A protein has these predicted regions:
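Short glycine-aspartate micro-motif
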Residues: 7-11, 92-96, 166-170
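Short glycine-rich, Thr/Ser-proximal phosphate-binding strand/loop in the N-terminal lobe
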Residues: 11-62
């Protein structure tokens, strides 16, 4: 029998307080949460993130260094979660890393839509030994979306019901 593989999800929000990590297994009609953790983001890295997010002119060097630092932090969060759940890298189907959004300009609001997340997924893959899937927002924008592809698909899968109507509130960074 082939045991179900685990998936790890990593993200940090607009508050930049921590990296949230979750280990999951998916069945046909169920999601099994195997473990979670919040991994703190050091103050110096937070300062860099806010600088990259808020200033019109940014340093390419700061962007590259912060991208690398966050890649290391996301890796550490994934490894900490794997250890706390006793999950080996070969049991992981994939790690999904949202990264840290520093700029987001979806279609319809800007002449040239774009989105930029940092937290190098190559570092996460190298440190964990797992396949990493990332850059969700830019892929969604490239296909004509608003750069938020995961939440609607997740909500539809988890909350759909043949006979009941449901409303889901997602006010990004405020009430997810």
């Amino acid at each position: 029998m082939n045991p179900k593989k685990f998936f790890i999800g990593l993200m940090s929000g607009t508050s930049v307080d921590s990296i949230d990590a979750v280990a999951l297994q998916f069945g046909r009609d169920e999601v099994n949460i195997c473990g979670t953790c919040s991994y703190p983001i050091p103050t110096a890295v937070k300062t860099s993130i806010f600088s990259l997010s808020e200033q019109n002119e940014i340093s390419i060097e700061l962007l590259c260094k912060t991208d690398t630092q966050l890649g290391e932090l996301f890796s550490q969060a994934a490894i900490e979660l794997m250890l706390s759940c006793s999950i080996k890298p070969q049991q992981i189907a994939a790690i999904g890393s949202h990264g840290q959004t520093i700029r987001h300009a979806p279609p319809g609001q800007h002449q040239i839509p774009y989105s930029k997340q940092i937290g190098d997924p190559n570092i996460i893959a190298a440190r964990t030994g797992c396949m990493v899937v990332a850059d969700f927002r830019r892929a969604d924008i490239a296909h004509g979306g608003q750069g938020a592809p995961l939440v609607p698909a997740f909500h539809e899968q988890i909350f759909r019901h043949r006979h009941r109507h449901r409303a889901i509130i997602n006010i990004g960074g405020i009430a997810n």
